Amino acid sequence: MKLIRNILVTLSALIFSVNIANAGEKWDMALAYGAGNFHSANATEFAKNVTEKSGGKLTIVTHPGGSLFKGGEIFRAVRTGQAPIGERFMSALGKEDPLLEVDSQPFLATTYGAAMRLYKASKPEIVKGLDSKGLVFLYAVPWPAQGLYSKKEINSVADLKGLKFRAYNSATIRIAELTGMAPTKIEAAEISQAFSTGAVESMLTSPTTGKNKKIWENGVGYFYDIAAWFPKNMVIVNKDSWNKLDAATQKLVMSEAAKAEKKGWDLSKKGNKNDKKALADAGMKVAKVNSALKKHFEEVGATMSKEWADRAGSRGQSVLKAYSGSSY
């Protein structure tokens, strides 16, 4: 009887061990933006495809809207392993690595074609920098072109002076300084409240963000289509979590990441067109700036690109040379 009991205990332990081994890895994916945002929807589809195709080896569960970690917390959470995977707005991480700010240099890349060339030129150095911080880069997707929102009409450089301006990274703070606007740091989740309370009167962001926030309901009547830059969100994985996957699963994740990146760029292009129309349909004035303002913004962009190149050093110079054939 004792022998039978010992055999049963041993078998139970073996079955339990097999079940644990077959359970696979589970990754909770931190997303800063709401479930309806195209970045979050794209990430959710990526997670679903990996989960379904991995044969139980990897399950990815998405947590949109900052429900797992807020936007400003995600990079650190993934780096420290509190979250195995997450998505973060790249240019908010300039203090981590200046290369992550390259896509937010005003008027450096003003079309999707140029944005893709800049991405290809900068990606190797960005991947290398993230690897040194214990992170694995999966994919990056741009927001639609950044335009200037304002509560009041802007017809001259003088109209910018003292305008309360939403800043969210070092680039937008510097733009405010160079144009005479007054910067206030506001995260994406706080945009509507900031405009409704008068904390800010203007911002640079995509037509998609304005549409999703129904920004016209907060007294914002103008969108100037200046196509300042195409900032990206990137998806990163904690390297220790990554190394727990077998080679086949790692290959699957990278394959699905490439598909998500392609789809994300297509969704961004579609949103760039459709969301500007949505702003106009809601009663906002959607327009280009006049030639004097355009020239002023381009001068600001040239100044900032030079400053960024100095800050980024030889790595930044090599990226700009690969992108445009010349350094700053």
Label each residue range with its predicted role.
Residues V9, A23-M116, S122-Y328:
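N-terminal secretory/targeting leader peptides
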Residues M1-L8:
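Bacterial N-terminal signal peptides that target proteins for export
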Residues F16-A23:
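Sec/Tat signal peptide C-region and signal peptidase I cleavage site
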